[in-house]
Amino acid sequence: MTDKSSAPSRSSRRVLLLAALLGVTAVATLVVTAVLVSIFEHKMDARSPFMRVVDLNEVSVDPSLWGQNWPHQYDQYLMTAGDTFYGGSAALPESKLDQMPWLKRLFAGYAFSIDYREARGHAYMLYDQVVTERVHQRQQAGACLHCHASPTVLYRWAGLEAMGLPSDEAALAADFNMPAVMKGFEVLSTKPYFEVLEMLTRMPDGTPGAPGPFPSPPVGGFTREDAPPGHFAMHEAHPVSCIDCHDPKTMAVRITRPGFMQGMADLAAGDAPVNAMPSVDRWRRGDRKEPYDPNKLATRQEMRSFVCGQCHVEYYCATMDTLEFPWAHGLRMEDMERHWDEKVFPDGTPFYDYYHGETGARLFKAQHPEFELWNQGVHARAGVSCADCHMPYERVGAMKLSNHNVRSPLENINNACQTCHNVSESELLDRVKEIQGRTVALKERAAAAMTEMLDAILEAKAAGATTEQLTPILALQSKAMWRLDFIVSENSKGFHAPQESARILGESIDYSRQAQTKALRLRAPEAPPTDDLPMEPVRGVTPTERPEAHR
């Protein structure tokens, strides 16, 4: 009885065991299959990180078009406006002229003494320029839009027109056409600002009649009292857009600004040392038959800085000549100063940005030389690009993307800094604050030296100093103020190259004090002779008693 009943029991256990094994195998198969499918899908995502919903071309300026293909990057681009786009006069950043009143004396005679404010994100770059009092109280050049707008379609149109070639929308959309863009850039650089702005609003942007992602600025300023004749809408004009840095067909990073193309060709043709630019060194060792072209020769890592260097640079931007990057002698502050010193305008007059409103000195105005100062710093020497810090990589699913919310690295320390610096966030913040604090303190000392220099020059003029006597003093003033302005206008507060910033400010102080001393000598009466004053010979050992003459 027992033997007969145990046989079915063993058989049942075998069936259950077999079923369990089949179940485990099935589950394991499903898990492995799911993992393999997930890996395959992630690999496919990494190979094809976007789905092309709309076709783009060379007139697809409106970034909302690109956002349909790359929604993640577009959403981050919109974040450059902050949580909400703040327009209107009450929303403008605080005036630097109120923060640092001595700037009014630094810029006396120049439009920046009228209105000069803290910079905001890329979303505001066109808005804030259109409403600044600088463009309403003083006539500015169309060259300003080279960097404050997305102007390449306009440049191409003007170039094709000047070259006698078709310039309809089909021709504009077909090809970037750098020769036409360069020609249009030359044609429009010296034209009045509002004339070029109005032309920009008539260019196709891929979404005719539709408003852009950000509100349009009031073209006549906030009161509209100074609105130019034929007041126009701003719908088709955009701040920097996707098309300014990317090829719409391949998405490759590219250079679109004519000023940078010419500036890099001039830099490469010279012999000045450069950091983080291996393609320039390779070109210099070659046959040099064609000018250096970053779009053909630069590495991807170089391009991650070059696209920023299209605008975050020093340049001439006014009505006397075509916009120009002063890089023929190099990227150091004194290299650019030498370039401006040697330059003459087309009419033969020596180059200047403005003549100082108090002293009449011929001065150069620095713009925002972040690219040049960065090139002198340790990060550039280490091969760290602008985008590595300001647009750091991040993981989104299987994709590795650059963060398109372009901003200070201090707002994204984990991705921007701690991928290289294995220290705490608080320590990194303290390092930056220390560097910037020292630079600001030195800047204030340079500003104090500048104001005392200006006072001394004015007193010398009041005392009857001649033009011949003042000429070398005004040359020192120019050197002092160029150096101070260089660091004031650069937006990192010295962080991009701390030692270089300190050197430049130290030279500014030195030149200011030299000019002040010479001016005081012109103002003061002749100094009495010092030959009869008691004097103790220099000794190698400190004497134990006071000299007889000083008892």
Region roles according to the model:
Residues M1-V15:
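N-terminal Lys/Arg-rich, disordered targeting/topogenic segments
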Residues R14-G23, V32-A119, R156-H238, P248-D388, ...:
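Primarily the internal scaffold of c-type cytochrome electron-transfer domains
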Residues S113-E118, V131, Q140, S150-T152:
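Long, composition-driven intrinsically disordered regions
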Residues Q137-Y155, G159-E161, D168-A170:
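A cross-kingdom signal targeting lumenal/periplasmic-facing segments of multi-pass membrane
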Residues H148, P239, I243-P248:
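Outer-membrane beta-barrel channel domains
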Residues A527-G540:
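Mature N-terminal, pre-catalytic/accessory segment of carbohydrate-active enzymes
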